[in-house]
Swiss-Prot record:
Localization: Cell membrane
Gene from which the chain derives: ENPP6
Cystine crosslinks: C142-C154
Listed name of the protein: Glycerophosphocholine cholinephosphodiesterase ENPP6
Residue numbers annotated as active site: S71 (nucleophile)
Length: 440
């Protein structure tokens, strides 16, 4: 009897260790700045590519980003399943007082330092360590050696990828799957975000950018069939955050009107969230003066709301400013981040921005998925950016590292056995093996 029970427990352990999708491939899209209502039911009627994907797969009501609702923090949250204060990528702009090094939205050389990236292990590193082949296209960070590891292939982001770049990346990724060169491919596309910033989330330019993506995705579903990948490939599409309207003409908070900028040791970022390091002896004075400013809140580090999962980050500044939705914080108007428009000079006004309180409706992103492991024509309740990691781990058949995601929020979207697999199964296997040992 003990032998039979032991055999059963061993089979249970091995079964839990092998998700149904263990050898299926995964194609991931990160579409920057894609607000949830861009693919409302009404909008889908003019987006045949997205409409087909929704009918064939899963669409969540919306995805709530991590705070701050900025790009780099959520790039890492999505790929680690951890809050910003855990993975340490707490902003697009960061400063480390100990080393006097800065992270400036990934464009400066010091942004490539392990200092910023080694706080957590992203999925592509875990897969690469497991001898799985990972192809990444324009994905911020794929060019960085993280925890001593680089992906199999990285087409480095240097300029905003064009629509043709995007289409070529999709085609190349599918060819890589067919040839066996890739197990995971991850594609980043930024144009929807760029047009949303420059012209606003409701602008014709942003809508044109979305239609261009829709066209490529429509072709993609056809290309998957042509390459015979429909039973071997899962596709997941998500965004890092949404976008809201801003009004530089009347909703700008200029810090130099309230404090002396000479009393600051360092300032990082402009917009919804600004980090301040007061000069020695100036903390209380600056805090008291900024506490009276309307349309923003100034937080000392320990007073930052716990719901942001932000204040424990090691790069969080002594003072953090958070603007009300639609308001923009800067040192002065001359320091506003104008963009280079058709004049060839940096004088274009920004019309859209993100980074605000992550619970605001306009900050919501998207999550779509289809393939052999996902239910079809299925609408799911809202999820959070920390939840996406467990879904990806499940469908590629790899053990997720400890994370902040909720399995109960995402298991409903998966078919059959995949939906019942726990997000972290080693503890179950360990229990089975311990019982087996005791019965031996």
């Amino acid at each position: 009897m003990a032998v039979k029970l032991g055999t059963l427990l061993l089979a249970l352990a091995l079964g839990l260790a092998q998700p149904a999708s263990a050898r299926r491939k995964l194609l991931v899209f990160l579409l920057d700045g894609f607000r949830s209502d861009y693919i409302s039911d009404e909008a889908l009627e003019s987006l045949p590519g997205f409409k087909e994907i929704v009918s064939r797969g899963v669409k969540v009501d919306y995805l709530t980003p991590d705070f701050p609702s900025l790009s780099y923090p959520n790039y890492y949250t999505l790929m680690t399943g951890r809050h910003c204060e855990v993975h340490q990528m707490i902003g697009n702009y960061m400063w480390d007082p100990t080393t006097n090094k800065s992270f400036d939205i990934g464009v400066n050389k010091d942004s490539l330092m392990p200092l910023w990236w080694n706080g957590s292990e992203p999925l592509w590193v875990t897969l690469t360590k497991a001898k799985r082949k990972v192809y990444m296209y324009y994905w911020p960070g794929c060019e960085v050696e993280i925890l001593g590891v680089r992906p199999t292939y990285c087409l480095e982001y240097k300029n905003v990828p064009t629509d043709i770049n995007f289409a070529n990346a999709v085609s190349d990724a599918l060819d890589s799957f067919k040839s066996g060169r890739a197990d995971l491919a991850a594609i980043y596309h930024e144009r929807i975000d760029v047009e949303g910033h420059h012209y606003g989330p409701a602008s014709p330019q942003r809508k044109d950018a979305l239609k261009a993506v829709d066209t490529v995705l429509k072709y993609m579903t056809k290309w998957i069939q042509e390459r015979g990948l429909q039973d071997r490939l899962n596709v997941i599409i998500f965004s890092d955050h949404g976008m809201t309207d801003i009004f530089w003409m009347d909703k700008v908070i200029e810090l130099n009107k309230y404090i002396s900028l000479n009393d600051l040791q360092q300032v990082k970022d402009r917009g919804p969230v600004v980090s301040l390091w007061p000069a020695p002896g100036k903390h209380s004075e600056i805090y008291n003066k900024l506490s009276t400013v309307e349309h923003m809140t100034v937080y000392e580090k320990e007073a930052i709301p716990s719901r942001f999962y932000y204040k424990k980050g090691k790069f969080v500044s002594p003072l953090t400013l958070v603007a009300d939705e639609g308001w923009f914080i800067t040192e002065n108007r001359e320091m506003l981040p104008f963009w280079m428009n058709s004049t060839g000079r940096r004088e274009g006004w920004q019309r859209g921005w993100h980074g605000y309180d992550n619970e605001l409706m306009d900050m919501r992103g998207i999550f779509l998925a289809f393939g052999p492991d996902f239910k079809s024509n299925f609408r799911a309740a809202p999820i959070r950016s920390v939840d996406v990691y467990n879904v990806m781990c499940n469908v590629v058949g790899i053990t997720p590292l400890p994370n902040n995601g909720s399995w109960s929020r995402v298991m409903c979207m998966l078919k059959g056995r995949a939906s019942t697999a726990p997000p972290v199964w080693p503890s179950h296997c360990a229990l089975a093996l311990i019982l087996l040992f005791l019965l031996a």
